A protein has these predicted regions:
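Active-site-adjacent loops and short helices of periplasmic peptidoglycan-processing enzymes
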Residues: 1-123
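Domain-terminus/edge residues, biased toward the C-terminal soluble/receptor-binding domains
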Residues: 88-92, 103-106, 110-323
Length: 323
């Protein structure tokens, strides 16, 4: 969740990767997995992200939380708000790095999967960090300069050829946990393992889950590159308006259906009434499998078309007779 809120703040322009982040005494005191940041040490936000994503640095997590929200407590409030927004009904955070082993700090595999999906789908640039296996950072403190090597805690990156990330975690109460992502043949999967008895078991179980997922999954992809006919406009300054698909269409089947049977139908009116706004929905492309709708893609107006007034009709009449 710390990474999710960090990338969200980056996307909103509240912070930048090159921002300097100063380490507080509290952040530097964090136990567990750490990158040994010193009090008053300054690192860029991007370096802090690497410390969190690669080495699970609890000290870096707290430093970033304090930088974004002013305090870890305020940041944790944001974490719980985001969890509620995402429908993570079985999750409650009490810190930003997972060190707390109290009954009030809890989650489930499903909720972690929801959170991981939100992070990776909205901010795929996270893979630039979670995919790092090893990288050096430089500590600049009053004691001088020193190099520290970040080693990924996600051993699946080397053990499973399709792995792309994402994040490990462990405490004495939670045991060994992992949210793992992988990509194969255009299919992106997330596997979440919690409560594994040892650190090797979580990677083995995640690999088993991911391999199973790929074996039972089949992807239907329509890039929607076919041209759509212009739509007639009534009462507008233009007689027609171009339309376009909003996006490609993807459907993941896990039931063993033949995706050759997918049919696409275009739902558009014969004509539209002016005015119309660019980007507004004109209709949709509907996808059916065995007669059942499996999804749709909005079809949008490509341009604005204003409503015609008297002078517009006059110009059209003059154009007709003069040309």
């Amino acid at each position: 969740m710390t990474l999710l809120l960090t990338f969200e703040a980056l996307d909103q322009g509240k912070i930048k990767l090159e921002d300097p982040v100063t380490v507080s005494a509290y952040a530097s005191s964090m136990g567990g997995s750490q990158v040994f940041l010193a009090e008053n040490e300054v690192q860029t936000l991007e370096t802090m992200i690497k410390c969190i994503a690669v080495a699970s640095g609890n000290d870096a997590s707290v430093a970033v939380a304090e930088y974004i929200a002013g305090s870890e407590e305020a940041f944790v409030d944001q974490m719980n708000q985001k969890a509620a927004e995402l429908g993570m009904v079985d999750t409650h955070f009490e810190d930003c790095c997972g060190l707390t082993d109290s009954d009030g700090h809890y989650t489930t595999a499903m909720d972690v999967a929801i959170m991981s999906r939100e992070l990776t789908v909205k901010y795929p640039q996270v893979f630039e960090y979670t995919g790092i296996w090893m990288e050096d950072i430089t500590h600049e403190t009053r004691q001088g300069s020193s190099t520290f090597t970040l080693n990924s805690t996600n051993k699946l990156l080397k053990q499973y050829q399709w792995a792309t990330g994402l994040k490990t975690g462990s405490t004495s109460k939670a045991k060994f946990c992992l949210s793992a992502t992988a990509t194969k043949d255009g299919i992106d999967l997330i596997a979440v393992v919690m409560g594994a008895p040892d650190y090797k078991a979580r990677f083995k179980d995640a690999q088993t889950l991911l391999s199973y997922g790929f074996n039972v999954s089949d992807l239907y992809l329509d890039e929607n590159t076919d041209a759509l006919e212009d739509l007639r406009i009534e009462g507008g300054v233009e007689d027609t308006v171009p339309v376009r698909y909003q996006s490609e269409f993807r459907y993941l089947d896990t039931e063993g259906n033949s995706l050759d049977g997918v049919k696409k139908t275009i739902e558009l009116p014969e004509k539209a009434q002016a005015p119309v706004a660019k980007g507004a929905e004109a209709g949709r492309a509907v996808y059916l499998l065995n007669g059942v709708e499996i999804g749709s893609v909005p079809i949008l107006y490509e341009n604005d078309v204003a409503k015609a007034v008297y002078k517009d009709y006059l110009f059209k009449i003059m154009e007709f007779y003069l040309l």
